[in-house]
Amino acid sequence: MIQESKAVMEMLTVETARTWLSLFIEKLEVNEKYLNTLDESIGDGDHGANMLRGAKDLKAKLAEGLQGGLSDLFKMAGMSFIQKTGGAAGLIYGQVFLHMSESFQEDSDLMDSLTSGLEGIQTFGPTELKEKTLVDVWIPVMEDIRNKRLTLEKINEYVTSTKDFQAKKGRAVYVSEQLNGHIDPGAASCGYFFEAMLEAGVYDE
């Protein structure tokens, strides 16, 4: 279980958060085909393309400039993914960003926002570790931030670990045996989100 995080106070600014989201967009652009390939094991093979639609919409909005603070920025991100990405990924990432936006109405603490983001994921039903979802990345990353030990290598480790888990959520359940040995596409895109966070300097050991 995620513990209370007030001991860790990584405070975001609008500038670093913009950089974080911009780097996330770049990673989705570069890795669209790879994410699609991962998604082919489930069926449609369009996770990368879907995520990129939301990312491009957000990129255009960021280019127009933003009047407001962190809450406004993440609300804008949430609406881009809900309105443009489509499918389960759009709803999940949309709720992640909207819940983070709500957290930023109270303070700019990174851990508070990530805790709220996890609650956004859980909006669609309780999800535990080792169920082959982005939670398998999100929760251990939060633990590493709390303990000041997060690295790019660890993020990749958490993404890769989903190969060994049996799918227990969504339509992946119906082809769970076929997915053995395959990385979860949602976990992979979540990995890019946290890689972008590190590269943006949001989290500082």
Positions of PLM-derived features:
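N-terminal loops that bind phosphate or other acidic moieties
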Residues: I2-E205
